[in-house]
């Protein structure tokens, strides 16, 4: 790719130069180009309009007859499988902490294995990111659940990121919503989520605060926009 060509040219022109500096210069230039194209020309890395969403598709069930419910959701190259398990009220999670005690009848677990980004890393313990993403999707889904009087079962989800190119947490909301419909959970309405991004252009003032500057908001950000963008925020609803 371009980075390999740049590193080769850099090594030829400056054989005693720092490799880390070359990588930093390349990253800075790409960052400037991504910002300039978005802010001045409304152009994104994959050619989409600023408010254009990638191709969507979803499948309810079809994974295994043994599962209580499942949903697969695709948004571009982001693919998430969500598996639903229903249990009796006694299967709830018992909360016994310093500040919180009670029972939890709805749980959502999120996994982000290395293969979802084409890596062969070790499958370790759940990290802080996975816990946070799982909690984020859980909060988004909690509002569409039926009341316990009409549906007293314990509801448990595991959302597995199969491929990642932006916002697997919000794709988990979509896949879990599909899984609940597949499993016969009488949800109030289907829920969906998406990631928004911000591209900001502006020099720093002497006070250290950013002066008013042009900005653009992107809908459905993917990997490069998430990496080079200045801010991202997740939105979920019905």
Language model features: what each stretch is:
Residues 1-101:
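Extended amphipathic alpha-helical scaffolds
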Residues 2-5, 23-28, 49-55, 154-162, ...:
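A glycine-rich phosphate-binding loop feature that marks nucleotide/adenosyl-phosphate handling sites
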Residues 29, 136, 140, 144, ...:
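Stable alpha-helical structural segments in soluble proteins, enriched in small hydrophobic residues
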Residues 60-63, 70-72, 94-98, 143-147, ...:
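A generic local secondary-structure boundary/capping motif
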Residues 65-75, 161-175:
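Glycine/serine-rich anion-binding loops at beta->alpha junctions
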Residues 68-153:
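Glycine-rich, flexible beta-strand/loop modules in the N-terminal catalytic cores of phosphate-handling
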Residues 121-127, 159-167:
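A short glycine/serine-rich beta->alpha loop
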Residues 180-202, 208-238:
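Mobile "lid/hinge" segments at catalytic clefts and subdomain interfaces of large enzymes
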């Amino acid at each position: 790719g371009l980075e390999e060509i740049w590193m080769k040219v850099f090594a030829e022109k400056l054989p005693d130069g720092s490799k880390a500096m070359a990588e930093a210069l390349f990253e800075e230039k790409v960052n400037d180009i991504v910002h300039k194209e978005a802010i001045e020309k409304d152009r994104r890395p994959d050619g989409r309009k600023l408010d254009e969403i990638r191709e969507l598709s979803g499948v309810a069930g079809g994974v295994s007859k043994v599962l209580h419910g499942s949903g697969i959701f695709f948004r571009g190259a982001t693919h998430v499988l969500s598996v639903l398990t229903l249990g009796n009220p006694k299967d709830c999670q018992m909360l016994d902490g310093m500040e919180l005690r009670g029972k939890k009848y709805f749980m959502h677990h999120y996994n982000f294995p290395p293969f979802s980004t084409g890596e062969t890393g070790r499958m370790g313990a759940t990290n802080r990111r996975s816990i946070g993403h799982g909690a984020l999707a859980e909060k988004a889904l909690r509002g569409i659940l039926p009341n316990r009087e009409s549906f007293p079962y314990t509801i448990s989800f595991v959302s597995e990121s199969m491929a990642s190119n932006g916002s697997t947490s919000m794709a988990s909301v979509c896949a879990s919503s599909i899984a609940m419909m597949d499993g016969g959970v009488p949800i109030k309405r289907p829920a969906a989520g998406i990631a928004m991004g911000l591209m900001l252009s502006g020099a720093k003032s002497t006070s250290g605060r950013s002066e008013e500057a042009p900005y653009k908001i992107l809908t459905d950000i993917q990997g490069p926009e998430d990496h080079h963008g200045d801010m991202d925020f997740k939105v979920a609803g019905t």
